[in-house]
UniProtKB/Swiss-Prot annotation:
Gene Ontology MF, one: UDP-N-acetylmuramate-L-alanine ligase activity
Species this protein is from: Lactococcus lactis subsp. lactis (strain IL1403) (Streptococcus lactis)
UniProt protein name: UDP-N-acetylmuramate--L-alanine ligase
Membrane-spanning parts: none
One BP term from GO: cell wall organization
Xref: Pfam families: Mur_ligase, Mur_ligase_C, Mur_ligase_M
Length: 443
């Protein structure tokens, strides 16, 4: 009898991507989640993957059960039912650790840039050689019998520890997830443990002092802009159309590359992709051709226009990510007003990085703050508010509410950069609706 894979929490970004990948490989897949809409469900619906509400009736002993990491006995009826009846299940990262053993696997780890880099690597490789992939924006592609598997490798709660890939990219090490990690040393320790799992090669950003501290049985290739990097980008040109650079491996030029993406961080992402592909022996001309056609991933500098107004949607929710996103906006729109609309994500992160958030938000011309989006894992003890953060920002900064986003209308030809990992897209949609109403009234 054909096995059924049931996903508890199928709308999660990693879970939805994994479900899609298994479906494309011909597996029978279904899943359950809340009835709220998530952007990840669109691909599942297009693939006709059954989406069910949480219910213990969904759980059968013959199913392969895969559970999202956030779900426990006390908050999910399916997990409670499985435990009560002794039905085995695997967490997402546990299942993935076993799954990748059938491929030459390439992980992408790092505090920032995982999803964009995974998407870029998957795009390039899948256009050259059969490659299955799993991206953190909810995108997955499964090819039965493919040689390579590209996946996003998450450090939170050390979820990447069941993974033993042949190769990995490490984009950076930074302190995040203060609800779990105690500090930068704790984060670095997690990456060191992960490095020990890698079988054939690590590609690490060379200007990151903590990545330089790592040791591993597999060789470590550093990439960046400095002379002591194994893979180095030179002759960098950043314009309103994207970025271009020459790539060198230990002094030997391996190609000229153009990527239609913005910000220094995306040059580094592209260089890491070039490094992996070069190490695998892929043709550099083909790599250059397919880098040029990369169009990004969901919720990473995703642009749209409403009349003359530019709206950018980005998942940035850490100071380092906000700085990179605003830098990218400046590169593409150097002569326009940059308006940051940021929703802090989790109270623990907002408390831990309040000063850093204020500092990087000053890179915008004007700042608006949405109410803090608390996670399901925490309780608001009223230790910090969005207004507290606004008071720290030197540039003009206001707090807005979802039921009144009209202050955002005060900027002619503004470039609005909506950033956050909570429900910031609701503010964005409210603003788009308001813009459309204003445009209609003016006609």
């Amino acid at each position: 009898m054909e096995k059924t894979y049931h996903f508890t929490g199928i709308k999660g970004s990693g879970m939805s991507a994994l479900a899609l990948m298994l479906h494309q490989m011909g597996k029978k897949v279904q899943g359950s989640d809340s009835t709220d809409y998530f952007f990840t469900q669109r691909g599942l619906e297009q693939a006709d993957v059954p989406l069910l509400p949480f219910d213990e009736k969904n759980i059968k002993p013959e199913f392969e059960l895969i559970a999202g990491n956030a779900f426990r006995d006390d908050n999910n009826v399916e997990i409670a039912f499985a435990h009560k009846n002794g039905f085995p299940f695997k967490r997402y990262h546990e299942f993935l650790g076993h799954f990748m053993e059938d491929f030459t696997s390439i992980g992408v780890a790092g505090a920032h840039g995982k999803t964009s880099t995974t998407g870029m690597l998957a795009h390039v490789m899948s256009n050259i050689v059969d490659t299955s992939y799993l991206i953190g924006d909810g995108t997955g592609r499964g090819i039965e019998g493919s040689e390579y598997f590209v996946f996003e490798s998450d450090e939170y709660e050390r979820h990447f520890m069941p993974y033993h890939p042949e190769y990995t990219i490490m984009t950076n090490i930074d302190f995040d997830h203060p609800d779990y990690f105690e500090g930068i040393e704790d984060v670095t320790s997690a990456f060191q443990d992960y490095a020990n799992n890698i079988k054939k090669g690590i590609f690490a950003y060379g200007e990151d002092v903590n990545l330089r501290k790592l040791t591993a049985k597999a060789p470590i290739y550093y990439y960046g802009f400095e002379a002591n990097d194994d893979y180095r980008a030179e002759n960098l040109v950043r314009s309103t159309r994207g970025s271009s650079f020459d790539a060198y491996f230990r002094g030997e030029k391996i190609g000229h590359f153009v990527v239609p993406a913005y910000g220094k961080h995306n040059v580094l992402n592209a260089l890491s992709v070039v490094a992996v592909c070069h190490n695998l022996g892929l043709d550099m001309t083909e790599v250059a051709d397919h880098l040029l056609t990369f169009r990004g991933v969901k919720r990473r500098f995703t642009e749209k226009k409403v009349g003359e107004t530019v709206i950018i949607d980005d998942f940035a929710h850490h100071p380092t990510e906000i700085e990179a996103t605003l830098d990218a906006a400046r590169q593409k729109y150097p002569d326009r007003e940059i308006v940051a609309v940021f929703q802090p994500h989790t109270f623990t992160r907002t408390i831990a990085f309040a000063d850093e958030f204020a500092e990087v938000l000053d890179h915008a011309d004007t700042v608006y703050l949405a109410q803090i989006y608390g996670s399901a894992r925490e309780v608001d003890h009223h230790e910090i508010t969005a207004q507290d953060l606004a008071d720290k920002v030197r540039k003009p900064a206001k707090v807005i509410d979802l039921d009144n986003v009209s202050p955002l209308l005060d900027h002619d030809r503004g470039v609005y950069v909506f950033m956050g990992a909570g429900n910031i897209q609701k503010y964005e949609l409210a603003f788009e609706k308001l813009l459309s109403q204003v445009s209609t009234n003016l006609q």
